[in-house]
A protein has these predicted regions:
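Hydrophobic helical membrane-anchoring modules
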Residues: 1-2, 20, 28, 53, ...
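Short, well-formed alpha-helical segments that are part of the catalytic scaffolds
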Residues: 11-26
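Donor nucleotide-sugar binding loop of glycosyltransferases
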Residues: 11-15, 42, 103
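Short beta-strand/loop segment that forms part of the nucleotide-sugar
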Residues: 31-41, 62-64
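A conserved acidic beta->alpha catalytic loop
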Residues: 39-48, 100
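Acceptor/aglycone-binding surface of glycosyltransferases and processive sugar-polymer synthases
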Residues: 60-81, 90-92, 103-187, 220-226
Length: 226
């Protein structure tokens, strides 16, 4: 089972298209899956957009009316997947952004790497001419600090050059080990890049095998300041 986890806040403009693409992709790439969405107190039409998809695909929505932030939304999704799995060694969590910057077309290769034995596969965003200038500058700065000692020891992950992205697949037994070590303590309430680094480092420490996969992000549908 693959649990596709989407932390969501005010994604009404993109979440429907993303779910449609995920559903279409799994019709061709046959794997058992379930989409878990954490609706983090959205104020737009996110919840209404989700409703019809629950009738045509395996979709479960959690969340509430109080905003908890990205880090705690991811934490809640990981715990939900951990509670639902029956085979943690065989099952996996896929974390994606709900704003469509993470394309479903990369899912088959992520899954193949996982099925080949990787406990964690991190999607590393390819920076090219199509990447917006603010994102290119940020990516250059982030890669610079991962190479700079002593910052490398604080944010770096062996074999991963971009620990700041949110697109990854993780074996659920590894997620379970991380949650057990963390007990009831959730991810810190920090900004998205910091939360992604913290989670990637925690998972990498528990994983036996870590891989990275170059991916092309989509910036043409919705560009955020972050």
């Amino acid at each position: 089972m693959l649990y596709i986890c989407l932390p969501t806040h005010d994604e009404g403009a993109t979440i429907g298209v993303l779910l449609w693409r995920i559903r279409a992709m799994f019709q061709e790439f046959s794997r058992e899956y379930e989409v878990l969405v954490y609706d983090d107190a959205s104020t737009d039409a996110t919840r209404e957009t989700l409703e019809p998809y629950a009738k045509v695909m395996p979709l479960h929505v959690i969340g509430g009316t109080t905003r908890v932030g990205y880090a705690r939304a991811v934490d809640a999704l990981l715990r939900a997947a951990n509670e639902r799995t029956r085979y943690p060694r065989r099952d996996a969590v896929v974390l994606m952004q709900a704003d469509f910057t993470d394309g479903p077309e990369h899912l088959p290769e992520l899954v193949k790497r996982f099925e080949g034995g990787a406990d964690l596969v991190v999607g590393e965003r390819v920076v090219d001419a199509a990447t917006p200038e603010p994102v290119r500058k940020l990516a250059g700065w982030l890669r610079w600090i991962t190479r700079l000692w002593p910052l490398r020891s604080a944010v770096g992950v062996t074999g991963v050059t971009d620990p700041f992205g949110g697109y990854r697949i993780v074996r659920l037994s590894t997620v379970r080990d991380v949650l057990k070590a963390r007990d009831a303590r959730p991810l810190a309430d920090v900004r998205v890049p910091s939360a992604n680094v913290e989670l990637t480092r925690e998972i990498a420490r528990a994983a036996r095998r870590v891989e990275a996969l170059p991916i092309t992000a989509r910036w043409d549908l919705r560009l955020r300041d972050t």
